[in-house]
Amino acid sequence: MTSKTKIDEIDVSIIRALQKDARTNFADIAKDCKVSLDTISKRFRRMRRTGVARGTTILLNPKNFGYDCVASFEIRVDYPHIEDVVDFVGKMPEIVFSTSSIGRYNIFAIAILKNVGRLGQLKESIQGHPMVREVAASIWVDEILLCPENFEFEHVKKK
């Protein structure tokens, strides 16, 4: 059993500030919290050490990179093959996140797509795996901000 890390209002203020902008200056957070810069630095280091904060990141808007839509896939597979299918789906170039889940579907995945037409093709590719029983797809319609590590920048020219 893992023990929960205790956090207080100052820790929450640090987290909220960094969620809004990962580049927020610790001095500004300290001023807002009415504590010293050293307090904020130590608390952030503690949150990193204990795993509360695993890092800071940038949010990307896929539409600014020429992607028309973001879609989620819910996939039902036979139980002993979940990890195999998670790996299979995760290797597809458009998939930026895949994980096992609990519920009607065993796997959840997120894809960024150049166009809506690609949705059906990707769904068919997933459905083509012999252990996949069902695939449901949904297109996200609201503002989309992602921070996946494996976001593809295929159109960027290499130097």
Feature-to-residue mapping (PLM):
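A compositional/biophysical signature of low hydrophobicity enriched in polar/charged and small residues
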Residues: M1-K159
